[in-house]
């Protein structure tokens, strides 16, 4: 008799994805972030569901409903802070996952990579809308500033902004639709992530060497399930340390002031995980130019496979590309820092230089380094 896990229509899918899946024997801890992202998504959906039970999407009561969750609901404070800081953990894992893909050349699997970019855009949109829901000062002004960027689109811009707002300004209609979208999008992300996984399992995983591993595969369970559980424990430890000791570390104090359309905060800025893109947006004095640079800063990932010039897949044996990659990481950290600073000298010029550096490394220097390394192979 065939084992039920291999014959049952539903259990068979789980078996082929997480148990008997042939996996390269040499994948490192950098391959843990995919499973951690899945865990983060489930955690966000669960905590978000419980928050939605007590939240009201009305401009007059939204702020007080969040306060009510923290003060009066049983363990409401931990649910709220797990959700808020869970988003930060989500983006840490997301950026590590993308970084791993760029370093080891995982972008050579085009379907998986492009669906990943779609996922990134969707997660960013979801996180942005979630930040608006507590209806604090930074929620309101962040929503106003970011949605207003759509007005830079020629001809249809102004109409588009008013259509998104549901009126002439960010108000009740905006909050209600953002709540509705923020609730539905994680389920869409879950569906798209399943397709992401489906395409990955069509080709099989990449590995640190960048070479084919068909001759050296091991079952996913128990080897990588155990490895993933270790990653999960470390993730939960970090999240709980953040939630229980300094839950507001990554938040903005301005968001503890109820939204007031008549009073603009001195420094409007998004959550920390969007600061690098915000710095790129601000580094261009022209509105349309800034919006284009902001969009390109993420869309540039779709160009990475086209700009691959090296004969080798990953950067494991490519020292020049490695230096450029870590320079890119430092550049992104610099942009993140600049995004949180006021628009004044010397921050403006540092932001502009870091933005030029960001696009130069990906579009010019990395393809050149690939060509140089190809020639070095012939020495």
Curated annotation (Swiss-Prot):
InterPro entries: Cyt_b/b6_C, Cyt_b/b6_C_sf, Cyt_b/b6_N, Cytb/b6-like_sf, Cytochrome_b, Cytochrome_b_C_euk/bac, Cytochrome_b_N_euk/bac, Di-haem_cyt_TM. It is a multi-pass membrane protein. It holds the Pfam family Cytochrom_B_C. Keywords: Electron transport, Heme, Iron, Membrane, Metal-binding, Mitochondrion, Mitochondrion inner membrane, Respiratory chain, Transmembrane, Transmembrane helix, Transport, Ubiquinone. It comes from the Eukaryota. It is found in: Mitochondrion inner membrane. Heme b b566 binds at residues 97, 196. Binds 2 heme b groups non-covalently. The keyword Membrane applies. Its cofactor is heme b. GO terms for molecular function: metal ion binding; ubiquinol-cytochrome-c reductase activity. A ubiquinone binds at residue 201. The chain crosses the membrane at residues 33-53, 77-98, 113-133, 178-198, 226-246, 288-308, 320-340, 347-367. Heme b b562 binds at residues 83, 182. One of its GO terms (cellular component) is respiratory chain complex III. GO terms for biological process: mitochondrial electron transport, ubiquinol to cytochrome c. Heme 1 (or BL or b562) is low-potential and absorbs at about 562 nm, and heme 2 (or BH or b566) is high-potential and absorbs at about 566 nm. Belongs to the cytochrome b family. The cytochrome bc1 complex contains 11 subunits: 3 respiratory subunits (MT-CYB, CYC1 and UQCRFS1), 2 core proteins (UQCRC1 and UQCRC2) and 6 low-molecular weight proteins (UQCRH/QCR6, UQCRB/QCR7, UQCRQ/QCR8, UQCR10/QCR9, UQCR11/QCR10 and a cleavage product of UQCRFS1). This cytochrome bc1 complex then forms a dimer. Component of the ubiquinol-cytochrome c reductase complex (complex III or cytochrome b-c1 complex) that is part of the mitochondrial respiratory chain. The b-c1 complex mediates electron transfer from ubiquinol to cytochrome c. Contributes to the generation of a proton gradient across the mitochondrial membrane that is then used for ATP synthesis. This is Cytochrome b.
């Amino acid at each position: 008799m065939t084992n039920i896990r291999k014959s049952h229509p539903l259990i068979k899918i789980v078996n082929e994805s997480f148990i008997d899946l042939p996996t390269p024997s040499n994948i490192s801890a950098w391959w843990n972030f995919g499973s951690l992202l899945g865990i983060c998504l489930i955690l966000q959906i669960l905590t978000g569901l419980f928050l939605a039970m007590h939240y009201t999407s009305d401009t007059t009561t939204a702020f007080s409903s969040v306060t009510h969750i923290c003060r009066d609901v049983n363990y409401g404070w931990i649910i709220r802070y797990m959700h808020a800081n869970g988003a930060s953990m989500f983006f840490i894992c997301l950026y590590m996952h993308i970084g791993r893909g760029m370093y080891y050349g995982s972008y050579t699997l085009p379907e998986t990579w492009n669906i990943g970019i779609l996922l990134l855009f969707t997660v960013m949109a979801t996180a942005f809308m979630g930040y608006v829901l507590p209806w604090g000062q930074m929620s309101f002004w962040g929503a106003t500033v970011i949605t207003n960027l759509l007005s830079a689109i020629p001809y249809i811009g102004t109409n588009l902004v008013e259509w998104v707002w549901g009126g002439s300004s960010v108000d009740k209609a905006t909050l209600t639709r953002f709540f509705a979208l923020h609730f539905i999008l994680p389920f869409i992300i879950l569906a798209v992530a399943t397709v992401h996984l489906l395409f990955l399992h069509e080709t099989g995983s990449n590995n640190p060497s960048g070479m084919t591993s068909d001759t050296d595969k091991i079952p996913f369970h128990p080897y990588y399930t155990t490895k993933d559980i270790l990653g999960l424990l470390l993730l939960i430890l970090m999240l709980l340390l953040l939630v229980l000791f300094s839950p507001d570390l990554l938040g903005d104090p301005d968001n503890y002031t109820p939204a007031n359309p008549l009073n603009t905060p001195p420094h409007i800025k998004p959550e920390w995980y969007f600061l690098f893109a915000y710095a790129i947006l601000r580094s261009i004095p022209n509105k349309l130019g800034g919006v284009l640079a902001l969009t390109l800063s993420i869309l540039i990932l779709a160009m990475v496979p086209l700009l691959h010039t090296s004969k080798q897949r990953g950067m494991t044996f490519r020292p020049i590309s490695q230096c450029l990659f870590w320079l890119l990481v430092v550049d992104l950290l610099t942009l993140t820092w600049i995004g949180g600073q006021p628009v004044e000298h010397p921050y403006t010029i540092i932001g502009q230089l870091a933005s030029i550096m960001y696009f130069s490394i990906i579009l010019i220097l990395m393809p050149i380094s690939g060509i140089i390394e190809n020639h070095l192979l012939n020495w």
